[in-house]
Design a protein with these regions (language model features):
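Catalytic cores of nucleotide-enabled group-transfer and carboxylate-activating enzymes in metabolic
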Residues: 253, 257-262, 309, 342, ...
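Walker A/P-loop
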Residues: 289-312
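Inter-Walker segment of RecA-like/P-loop motor cores
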Residues: 348-359
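Conserved pre-motif I regulatory segment
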Residues: 260-297
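Conserved Walker A/P-loop ATP-binding site and its immediately adjacent core
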Residues: 322-346
């Protein structure tokens, strides 16, 4: 920010002198509202520019997520760090006590005598129609607040973390966040759409999506600390678009650049290649819009890798997958496979639209 941090500010991220917290000298800070917008914008971008939208819909048994559903999931993403308004988290910047993380206080609210007294400032009561019932909403919120890769079990609630002080009022911080989220995603609150059902796999997948969005939204090479709180969502959406492009998460350009007749000739770099029998068999396996599982077992040297690449090309061209993942048992095998896949990708895609191959 373009001014020093004060105890009345709600910060999300800090930069210390020499990147060393022990110095106690904060040289820059990123506001909670700005980071909330960053992660929400990445979530929105991933749901509108990648296959993840289809994947989440399929876990529910739906054909697609509506734009209202996307807005609602993006709005939930904006609430992911709501626990940072607590006294315990904000105190970490000023050497005060008590201190706490930002996940467990939010989850522990579930064990408060009146959880809604703490969640109401976030507008939670207005979300009841987003899900099949309040239990589903509760689990979806747990997936939202517990976004650091492992489940968080509610524990003892500490009301002291939520009490107001001379410097800050956590309730006011939640209210302000809710106000902005409604401005950023009006369709989430004003639109109508079928309620999210009680589907644990969907909740789990949303948690994974949010974890990815938080990683990307926390990368300062894409999301530098804000200088001002003017138009945080406009800024966030611009950075999110740049990040999705830079990370090759949107495959549309690569898909469009793929030749319509790409096959074993291009994969192997051998014109007029006559496929092995197992390769012909894999080539002819049907593609299913709702997904499928193909199991290939064959002798070493029979061309299984190229067969898998040929199937990937067909799936990718049709928009049924965004990428390809090989799982092999040893580093040596992985290195050899990486070299072969890299060579095939170079032959399949022009340089400026070539998807990355990582190991």
């Amino acid at each position: 920010m373009d001014r020093p941090l004060t105890p009345s500010d709600f910060w999300a991220k800090l930069k210390y002198k020499d990147d060393d917290r022990s110095t106690g000298e904060i040289v820059d800070w990123h506001p909670l509202l700005a980071h909330s917008a960053d992660v929400a914008a990445v979530t929105e971008a991933l749901l509108t520019r990648t296959i993840l939208r289809d994947r989440l819909a399929s876990l529910i048994g739906w054909d697609d997520l509506s734009d209202v559903h996307v807005a609602r999931l993006s709005a939930l993403a904006a609430l992911h760090d709501a626990g940072k308004v607590t006294q315990g988290f904000q105190n970490r910047a000023f050497g005060r006590t008590p201190e706490s993380d930002h996940v467990t206080p939010m989850v522990n609210v579930y064990h408060a005598s009146d959880p809604l007294a703490y969640l109401a400032p976030l507008g939670i009561t207005d979300l009841k129609d987003w899900t099949a019932d309040l239990d589903v909403l509760g689990h979806l919120l747990l997936a939202t607040f517990g976004h650091h890769g492992t489940p968080v079990t509610p524990g003892a609630h500490d009301p002291m973390l939520w009490e107001d002080s001379d410097d800050r009022d956590p309730e006011a911080g939640l209210t302000r966040l809710d106000t902005h989220v409604r401005e950023w995603f009006p369709a989430a609150y004003d639109g109508t759409a079928p309620a999210f059902p009680a589907t644990p796999a969907f909740q789990h997948a949303f948690n994974g999506l949010l974890t990815l969005a938080d990683w990307i939204g926390s990368d300062t090479s894409f999301f530098p600390f804000a200088d001002t709180l003017d138009a945080p969502m406009e800024r966030a959406r611009s950075h999110a678009a740049e990040a999705v492009d830079a990370l090759f998460l949107d495959p549309d350009a690569s898909r469009a650049a793929l030749s319509a007749d790409s096959g074993f000739d291009q994969i192997l770099g051998q014109p007029d290649w006559d496929p092995y029998p197992i390769q012909e068999a894999v080539r002819d396996v049907p593609l299913h819009d709702n997904g499928g599982l193909a199991v290939l077992e064959s002798d070493t040297g029979s061309g299984k890798t190229e067969a898998a690449l040929a199937r990937y090309v067909r799936l990718f061209r049709k928009g049924l997958v965004d990428g390809l993942y090989f799982a092999v048992p040893t580093r040596t095998a992985a290195t050899q496979l990486h070299d072969r896949v890299t060579a095939a990708v170079k032959r399949l895609f022009p340089e400026d639209q070539r998807p990355p191959v990582v190991q």
